[in-house]
């Protein structure tokens, strides 16, 4: 099948793949055609970020699909990076991870605390990767406009 990959800015390209190909393979093909290192690529399908280790079929990507490509600045972490190093180096979250480390150290042995923290970071990063653009838009709207709280209608079922 042929996929179209469209950078936010720049010329799109087509890549020939099977539905069983991994996202990382698509990134390598795009790298060859657009001269953008795979480590700087973030592929999106219908607003959802694609994880390198998943297959195209995991996202129900079929023939003639269009993928959006976001190019990260050089040096920014890739989605396949190890969780602890990227999360600890992240300026916005380093305080949170340091605080978590302190709390875990009070309740676990150093080895167990490290394992628990590593798993929490992996789960956190996986959750972030699964956010769609719609999810992010809703979250931003709630944060920017808290006075317009949405009424909980779950009790109406």
From Swiss-Prot:
Physiological role: As part of a cytosolic protein quality control complex, the bag6/bat3 complex, maintains misfolded and hydrophobic patches-containing proteins in a soluble state and participates in their proper delivery to the endoplasmic reticulum or alternatively can promote their sorting to the proteasome where they undergo degradation. The bag6/bat3 complex is involved in the post-translational delivery of tail-anchored/type II transmembrane proteins to the endoplasmic reticulum membrane.
UniProt KW keywords: Cytoplasm, Nucleus, Transport
Organism of origin: Danio rerio
GO BP term, example: tail-anchored membrane protein insertion into ER membrane
Ranges where the Ubiquitin-like domain occurs: 1-76
Matches recorded under CDD domains: Ubl_UBL4A_like
A GO term for molecular function: protein-folding chaperone binding
Protein name (record): Ubiquitin-like protein 4A
Gene3D superfamilies: Phosphatidylinositol 3-kinase Catalytic Subunit, Chain A, domain 1
Matches recorded under Pfam families: Tugs, ubiquitin
InterPro entries membership: Ubiquitin-like_dom, Ubiquitin-like_domsf, Ubiquitin_CS, Ubiquitin_dom, Ubl4_C_TUGS, UBL4A-like, Ubl_UBL4A-like
């Amino acid at each position: 099948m042929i996929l179209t990959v469209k950078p936010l800015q720049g010329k799109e390209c087509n890549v020939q793949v099977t539905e069983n190909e991994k996202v990382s393979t698509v990134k390598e093909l795009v790298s060859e055609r657009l001269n953008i290192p795979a480590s700087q690529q973030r592929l999106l399908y219908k607003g959802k970020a694609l994880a390198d280790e998943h297959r195209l079929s995991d996202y129900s990507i079929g023939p003639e699909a269009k993928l959006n490509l976001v190019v990260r600045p050089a040096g920014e972490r890739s989605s396949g990076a190890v969780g602890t190093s990227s999360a600890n180096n992240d300026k916005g979250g380093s305080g949170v991870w340091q605080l978590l480390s302190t709390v875990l150290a009070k309740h676990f042995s150093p080895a167990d605390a490290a394992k628990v923290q590593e798993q929490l970071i992996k789960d956190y990063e996986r959750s972030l990767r699964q956010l769609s653009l719609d999810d992010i838009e809703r979250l931003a709207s709630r944060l920017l406009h808290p006075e317009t709280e949405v009424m909980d209608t779950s009790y109406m079922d």
